[in-house]
Amino acid sequence: MKKILLVASIFATMAFNSLFAQYDELRILFADQKYEKVVKLADKMIGDDKFKKDPMVYYWLSKGLYKVSQSGNTAPEYKNAYKESINHLGKLLRNDKEGEAIQEDEINEYLLEVQGSLVEQIKNEISTGNFRKASSWILTYKKVTKNPIGQMLLEAAGKFKADDKSGGIAGLKVAETELAKVKDIKDFTEADKEMFKLGLIWGAEGYTSIRQVEKAKALLEKGSEWFRQDEDFQEAYNKMAR
């Protein structure tokens, strides 16, 4: 019996060491800036049953793709590397049931970086009047946040811009139901806060476009306790007050 237990223990230790050896290989490849190899190894690992729900492997796959998207690699298989990196980051969050992975500093920092890059994409498209393209990124943001209220408001605002007034009204109704549950934003990331602020401003703009000014004012009022010191929010708020 002791021999059986000893053999079982040896195999368990070998499997454990093998697991971390593969993590180490991903880390080493990443440190060497061999991002395509990181992607290929992580993708191969996910095909194995023991890794397919492993948040750490999705982290390396996402981060590898994110770096490839910034590297200028024009290979066809990496054409959508940025979007794919976000998809896999979303899978990391979904598989991180206990929230342990996201507590790791390096993973949390990466999440914040990706969120910030998405917000910049959204703001750039909105600033050039391309709300249709911004809407695609707004939908994508939902995959990488635990605080989607800003995303919900902006998604509804996008429907007004697409002349889908009934969809916009319905979207704002759902979003405002969720907004009523928001008691504070201390757990929001900086990107979450920016999305929330933008959602309030453009959601109010949506109401104004159908001449429901009082609803626009009421929506902005709901966010005033958190954003009254913000210049952009205050400008929109004062505009509605006139």
Give the predicted meaning of each segment.
Residues M1-I28:
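Bacterial Sec-dependent N-terminal signal peptides
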Residues F20-K83:
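Start-of-domain marker
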Residues A42, D49, L65, L89, ...:
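Alpha-helical junction/boundary sensor with strong preference for TPR arrays
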Residues A101-I201, T208:
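Extended amphipathic alpha-helical interaction segments
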